[in-house]
Amino acid sequence: MRDLFVVGIVLASLPITLIRPWVGVLAWTWLSLMSPHRYCWGFATTFPVAELVAIATLVGCLSTADRQPIPRVWQVGVLVCLWSLFGITTTVAFNPDPAFYQLIEVSKVLVMTFATVVLINDRRKLFYWVVVIALSLGLVGLKGGIFTLLTGGQHRVYGPPGTFIGDNNDAALALCMTLPFLYFLPRLVRGLDLGRWWAWLGRAAPVLTLFTAIAVVGTYSRGGFITLAVVLVALTWRSRYRVVVAGVMVIAVVVGAGMVTIQWKARMGTIETAEEEDSSFRGRLGAWEGARNIARARPFTGGGFHAFQGWVWDAYFPPEGQGHDVHSIYFEMLGEHGYPGLAIFLLLLGGSFLQAERMRRRARRLGNTEVETYGAIIQIALAAYAVGGAALGKAYWDYFYDLIILLVLVHTLLPLAADG
């Protein structure tokens, strides 16, 4: 029944997508972030739902007049440069066949990224897209939070297997990045005249925020816990009621400290001694050293996609790093695409973070709550990605590029943001 439900929704969306391709962007975002078909147990797990939606969206995009030109902003140029570099490094990759396959996968993400820029062309569509982002992972957080409470935190929270959030650490990062979307969603709902039906979303968002934070704790991810702390501090600082929010968080921490399991406390207790006692962490350090060695040998191209495997381990990695993925967005870019790849990636991440801050400050000064809220969401989500991604290989993840495009769209569609 679950399989029929998910596939039925996808198939029903296809004719709508051909007529209104921006709906396909919403469906694609839902499928790429939440991967609902991976929660099924039958034929839906391998059914090409994302591919069908992508094809319908692109066909509709070519035939519709309801679209805008690609905005002339610096992020678009940087994305094109990064995409071009991916193509160049693939031609000289250590492992050509896996590298070419990964280039195709990354290209699919970037094609849909540019389709999003073209098709989300007004304020309401932008809001609907943000709601889809928030709920796609907010529902995962709700499920994980309930699971954590019902089991007393005895078991770890995972995402659906075979997805970008299948691992507990990956799920923790995704949920941390989603917290600002959920936290600020009521403010966006109040700012738009969408009718009473949408009021439920504003009331449900705080509940989703709470359960999502609980789910992060339930992942047992040390990196996720550190990222959660960063996000909670940022949310408190950006809140209009800092004292109240800080008080609630202090109470939650005190209560939560008495509820967490001995296993969880022991796991978090290894953060300070990870380098000496944790073989997994030592393996990551070795993998990072291997990435640096590749960059020293091939500073302009790196080893290409999927460089960290096979004979490359023996040639470039210290013994403790062999057999490990690089587990870092920064060292992943450095090892696979050299110093140019890392520089472009940092420009995209850091430049967008700073632009979101400038946009937020100007909007607050001029009293534009909507733009201020979007700026805060983007900035905190990027901060979560920058912190949590330091120990995870998620440089090609859809979610990061969604954040960049969200900033581009806010800059393009909301005049106050564009003036900043």
Task: Describe each model-derived feature in a short phrase.
Residues M1-D3, A44-L52, Y101-Q102, F164-T178, ...:
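Membrane-interface micro-motifs in multi-pass membrane enzymes
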Residues Q154, Y158, G162, E272-E289, ...:
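Long extracytoplasmic/lumenal interhelical loops at the membrane interface
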Residues H337-A384, D402, L406, T412:
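Hydrophobic transmembrane alpha-helices and their immediate junctions
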